[in-house]
Design a protein with these regions (language model features):
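Structural/interface elements that position substrates and couple domains in central-metabolism enzymes
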Residues: 1-180
Length: 180
């Protein structure tokens, strides 16, 4: 959709008006200890009959790579505008909204990959108190200190009207439909 200039969130909302359609909300990838892992057991056991499962998992895994690439483009643009090294706020680390579980989290993978590649990352995860790899910031702190914003998880806190308005104003990269 992005390549064609189509707003995926509007497209999903429109399609879901049909009574027999229920398109799920895409995100920065698929995580958790079940859906992200268990299909690979089926693929390993019967690869010939699990081609669709393999393809689905590969497509979902690539979504995380695509999100990282989009963030890198935004960082390069911000750097070109300011001449400084931009700080990236990764909003959400959990594998799904409003939980403290980071197992197989695509959001955590994105933040960690950016950090490992030398990007200045500030992490916001309202459902945990600390993380071994990141110093956590509040949403307010991140909104004040960062230059590029990536909404990776649709946490309730990020949906608050003032937060949502600020993310729209800051032209946040929205990988989960908060600003749509």
């Amino acid at each position: 959709c992005a390549k064609e200039g189509i707003n995926v969130w509007n497209l999903i909302q429109l399609a879901n008006r049909h009574p027999r359609v229920n398109i799920l909300q895409p995100g920065a990838g698929v995580g958790g200890h079940c859906i992200a892992v268990d299909p690979w057991f089926i693929v390993a056991r019967d690869p010939g009959n699990a081609q669709l499962i393999r393809t689905a998992r590969e497509v979902n895994n690539h979504k995380t790579v695509w999100a990282i690439d989009q963030i890198k483009i935004a960082v390069a643009d911000a750097s070109a505008r300011t001449g400084c090294k931009p700080k990236v706020a990764c909003l959400g680390l959990a594998f799904k909204p409003d939980i403290d579980d980071l197992r197989e989290s695509p959001a955590l993978h994105i933040a960690a990959a950016l950090n490992a590649q030398g990007y200045d990352v500030v992490a916001v995860e309202p459902n945990i108190k600390s993380h071994e790899q990141f110093e956590l910031a509040s949403l307010e702190e991140a909104l004040e200190s960062a230059d590029v914003f990536a909404v990776l998880v649709k946490h309730r806190q990020f949906l608050a009207p003032l937060a949502k308005q600020k993310l729209v104003e800051l032209k946040a990269l929205d990988f989960c439909g908060i600003t749509a």
